[in-house]
Amino acid sequence: MSDGHEPVLLDEVLGWLDPRPGGRYCDATLGLGGHARAILERSAPDGRLIGIDRDPQALVVAGASLAEFGDRVTLVHAPFSRALEVLTEVGAVPVDGFLVDLGVSSPQLDRPERGFSFRDSGPLDMRMDPSQGETAGDLLRRVDEQELESIIRDYGEERYAGRIARGIIAARDRGELDSTGALGAIVARAMPRHEWHKNPATRTFQALRIAVNHELEQIERLLDQLADCLRPGGRLCIIAFHSLEDRIVKRRLRALAGRAGTGAPARVRLLNKHVVVAGDAERARNPRSRSAKLRAAERI
């Protein structure tokens, strides 16, 4: 990509989705449009793509990048949990291929005003859609120490959640919690010194981002409707980036494949027995790919 953005696990995604002329495809986490562009190129001259993203800024960037494909592209501002509704509204149900990339996009991380990163100080926002819901600052102002500890422990899998929560609440009560930079420093001070070399705020920022955007609930809602989005033989690819996401995806896909022990009929066939990860070359070239895990399935 000319903007320096490299979509994660692109060859693997294209291999599983196998885009073809005349097909209909959905990228439910459009981002900068890297995967979408490759799908459109593979499905030329008349394959159609519906791109969904809850971040309006991402839609602007991707819209400009994909403009050359004209009316083969339909972009919709919505969370991926509304995918079936969106596809129905634009007359694209069922689709031949469906992609979900659950990672935070590089522009979100790189722009301090979005509040996702502690590398450059910015407002405590962290919303995927800046027009919706409470910010991280709002959340931190309303929760008590016990609630905050639970968020950090459950969504960040942080062993020092109690210490961090106490430090954050104390700083809040002193009026010191006013930016991502301040939050990162507060978390670092609460951590044992021997943990400082590992970007100590990473797990806490992940936890707050998940809580602000209701990310795990969004994934559950999406997986409830995925089979209804796909035609028989249609393919699904989901890329997760941390264990909380991947556990949900693995469990729900197994259930859809009739392997949950509930007696429910199978609606999909799992395509990869083991999770697919990036190869050494991609991991060296694209650091974002190092934690990516791809699972694929086919509608029965």
Describe each region flagged by the PLM.
Residues 1-300:
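S-adenosyl-L-methionine-dependent methyltransferase catalytic core, i.e., the SAM/SAH-binding region
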